[in-house]
A protein has these predicted regions:
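Domain-level marker for long, solvent-exposed, non-transmembrane regions
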Residues: 14-206
Length: 206
């Protein structure tokens, strides 16, 4: 089984600078919580070190965190399967939120009466589907965890970073493709482009 090649590292790591002590403390606390839940690091570095490095990157205001879980009935047999499903889950989660953000802005702009119009619904569905495709290449995996199950499978959790500048370009590409199938979107291209360009805060599921 692939898990045989995965280690939980316990090697000592360099203590961070004094100014980063709060971040290091948070990383250690989160690492303990995750370890208590049975999670192990997929890699040779310690969980607290990977969390600390992850938190440092989140200090960049252009980066957001996206956490993907492959757990429960969707657990997998290998790490490669976990990685593939996690990326799909992350992209799907982001695309749903991107669509709902546009739905809300269009509804506020045009009124609720526009909802349900075939051309509008076609654009929403097409936009969500295209965002899934476009955003996959922009997701940068920070690190991942696994948890062995009694049935021989594993739960998998991946932590991604998403840069808003790259995400915005991905949303624009998705919008342009979705507009090809929507008369409503083509007629309102300028306003919809403005909505799509505006970023939003990602909501991660527990």
């Amino acid at each position: 089984m692939l898990l045989a090649g995965v280690m939980f590292a316990g090697a000592a790591t360099a203590q961070p600078k004094t100014s980063d002590k709060a971040m290091w403390k948070s990383a250690r606390k989160m690492a303990k919580t995750l370890a208590d839940e049975g999670w192990k690091i997929d890699g040779s570095r310690s969980m607290e070190e990977m969390l600390y490095n992850h938190y440092q990157k989140l200090n960049d205001e252009n980066n957001q965190e996206l956490i993907a879980n492959v757990i429960g009935n969707t657990s997998v047999k290998t790490m490669n399967q976990g990685q593939q499903w996690a990326q799909i889950n992350a992209a799907t989660t982001y695309a749903k939120q991107a669509k709902m953000m546009v739905v809300g802005r269009i509804t506020n702009e045009t009124g609720a009466g526009i909802e349900g119009a075939p051309s509008v619904d076609s654009f929403y569905e097409g936009y969500e589907s295209q965002v899934v495709t476009e955003i996959k290449g922009e997701l940068k995996k920070s690190f991942s965890l696994y948890r062995e199950k009694e049935n021989g499978g594993i739960d998998y959790k991946a932590f991604y970073l998403l840069n808003e500048a790259s995400a915005s370009q991905a949303r624009i590409r998705a919008m342009e493709r979705a507009m090809l199938e929507s008369e409503f979107a083509r007629a309102n291209a300028a306003r919809i482009s403005e909505f799509v360009r505006n970023g939003f805060s990602i909501e991660n599921e527990e």
